[in-house]
Amino acid sequence: MGLSVNTNVASLNAQMNLSKSSSRLQQSMERLSTGLQINKAADSAAGLVISEMQRKEISGLSGAIKNIERGVNAVQTAESGLGEVNDLLLKVRSLTVDSANAATQDSASLAANQAEAGKLLASITRISDTTKFGTTNLLDGSFSAKQFQIGAFSGENTSLTIADTDAASLSIDAIDMTTTAGANAALISVDAAISTVAMARGTLGAFQSGTLEATKNNNTSQLVNLQAAESNLRDTDYQKEIASFTSEQIRSQVASTVLGMANQSSQQIVSLLRG
C-alpha cells in the first residue's frame, strides 16, 4: 500500500475498530456491574418493552397473592368465630333436650335451664357482634358481597357474603324452654340454627380452599414462570458476559496495537523526506 500524507486510511480503520471495541467493552462492563443485560431501551427496545410488561404482571401477582393470604386469614377468623357459635348452640341444644324430658323436670329445673340458655344466647350474639378481622366485622351481617382482588388485573376478583349469626338472626333469641311444649319447639329452632351455622362454615371452607387457595397456587405458579422468563430476558448471564468481556478486551488491545502501527506510517513519510 502506498503512503499518503492527507489520509491515513489504515489509521482511520484502526480508530473506527478501536471505537467500536471500546463501546462494546463499556456496554459489557455495564452489564457486569448492574447484573442486567438490558439497562436502557437502546440495549434492546423490544426486550425492554417485554420485560417491563412482565414486571408489571409480576408486581400484580405478588400483590394478589398477599391479598389472598389476608383473605384466608379473614375467612379463618370468621370460621373460628362460627365454631365458637356452634359449640354454644350444642350446649343450648343439650338444655332443650333436658327441658323436654317432662317426666323428670320440675318448674325450678326448667327455669334454671332457661336462665342458662339465655346466657349462652347472649354469648352467641356477643361473638357475632365482636368477631373482626382488623376493623372489619365478619359475623354481624355487614360482611356482604365483600370483594377480594385475587388477580393481577382489573376484574380478576371474587366476592363473599357472611350472614349475621346473632341469636335473633338464627331465630333462637325468643326460645322458651320453661314448658315441655316450649322445649320441643326450641329444639327444632336450635337444630335449624346449628344447620345454618354448619352451612355457613362449609361455605367459608369451600371459599378458602376452592377459590382463595386454589387461585393462590395458580398465581404462584404464574409468578415463578414470569420471574424466570423476565430474568432470562433481562438479567446478565455472567458466564457468557465474562467471556464476551475478555474477548472484547483482546480486540481492544489488538486495535490499539494496529492503530499504533498505522500511525507509524506517517513517521515513515517524514523519514523519507528527511532522506
Predicted segment positions?
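Primary detection of the long, small/polar-rich alpha-helical "axial" segments characteristic
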Residues: 1-275
